[in-house]
Amino acid sequence: MKPSIILYKTLPDDLLHRLEAHFTVTQVPNLHPETVARHAQAFASAQGLLGASETVNRALLEKMPALRAASTISVGYDNVEVDALTARKIVLMHTPAVLTETVADTVMALMLATARRVVDVAERVKAGEWTESIGPAWFGVDVHHKTLGIVGMGRIGMALAQRAHFGFTMPVLYHARRRHQEAEDRFNARYCDLDTLLQEADFVCVILPLTAETRHLFGATQFARMKSSAIFINAGRGPVADENALIAALQNGEIYAAGLDVFEQEPLSVDSPLLNMSNVVAVPHIGSATHETRYNMMACAVDNLIDALQGKIEKNCVNPQAAG
């Protein structure tokens, strides 16, 4: 008899068939309490859980006594109570490698769009304001040869450093929990403390997960330390930056511009002051959002769950200690 799983994300037919070859699959639209109650028997017997974006917490786990593995279609897992899973000896699988290059492309796009004011001037053209040869009021700033500061030198940070170093001849600074010798060897990246990075970088790019330590790591003090010509890019998690402090820094001219893929509350409120600032490029958490990468993430998550329920957790496991 096949193990049973709960699927709370729509998958392409080929990936669904791959799951069904190994498991009895119950598809649900979400993990809301009313959904769990409606499918109580399926949740109670499920050994696997696969999906994205929904909260996985102790209350849900109480309804899933047979659960052995959860697989998230994401690299981040701040919506999952990992400690609760580990305490129950439930492994959590994620998809870190398949989105690296695509997210780095997004960060680079935000750097270019903010520096060259692409969104702002494109909207002005559409509004009929381009009536003569443009002057300084339409100009942006260069990206090439400027100093890039990366906060969080993981896979995505490395991919960004590669683009900046080889493609744009940018000196690279980085701050992370530990030094990254490969980044220093390949890209001549210089490790420094956060204050030094903030004071020297022309672009401050944040690629951090959300933890107790990183929440509001960037606040009024940090923005005040940045150059008035600096551009702030956040492509990690929204709450890593205090959004009110960022808004104030932009309004007061403490920094030049911001490119934001993530926000403290998502979707971003239509009343947010950020949406009225011509020096802000705000996009709806599109970091990995290409057809190719999202398919690859789903395929990876499917394979992760198949492997995990066969006891294979050598790669992509967040909490391997849970299997011990």
UniProtKB/Swiss-Prot annotation:
The keyword Protein biosynthesis does not apply. It is found in: Cytoplasm. It holds the Pfam family 2-Hacid_dh. GO terms for molecular function: glyoxylate reductase (NADPH) activity; hydroxypyruvate reductase (NADH) activity; hydroxypyruvate reductase (NADPH) activity; NAD binding. It catalyses: glycolate + NADP(+) = glyoxylate + NADPH + H(+); (R)-glycerate + NAD(+) = 3-hydroxypyruvate + NADH + H(+); (R)-glycerate + NADP(+) = 3-hydroxypyruvate + NADPH + H(+). GO terms for cellular component: cytosol; plasma membrane. It comes from the Bacteria. Keywords: Cytoplasm, NAD, NADP, Oxidoreductase. Its EC number is 1.1.1.79, 1.1.1.81. The keyword Cytoplasm applies. It is an enzyme of class 1 (oxidoreductase). PROSITE patterns: D_2_HYDROXYACID_DH_2 (PS00670). The active site is at R237, E266, H285. SUPFAM superfamilies: Formate/glycerate dehydrogenase catalytic domain-like, NAD(P)-binding Rossmann-fold domains. Belongs to the D-isomer specific 2-hydroxyacid dehydrogenase family. GhrB subfamily. Homodimer. Catalyzes the NADPH-dependent reduction of glyoxylate and hydroxypyruvate into glycolate and glycerate, respectively. HAMAP family: 2_Hacid_dh_C_GhrB. This is Glyoxylate/hydroxypyruvate reductase B. It comes from Salmonella gallinarum (strain 287/91 / NCTC 13346). The gene is ghrB.
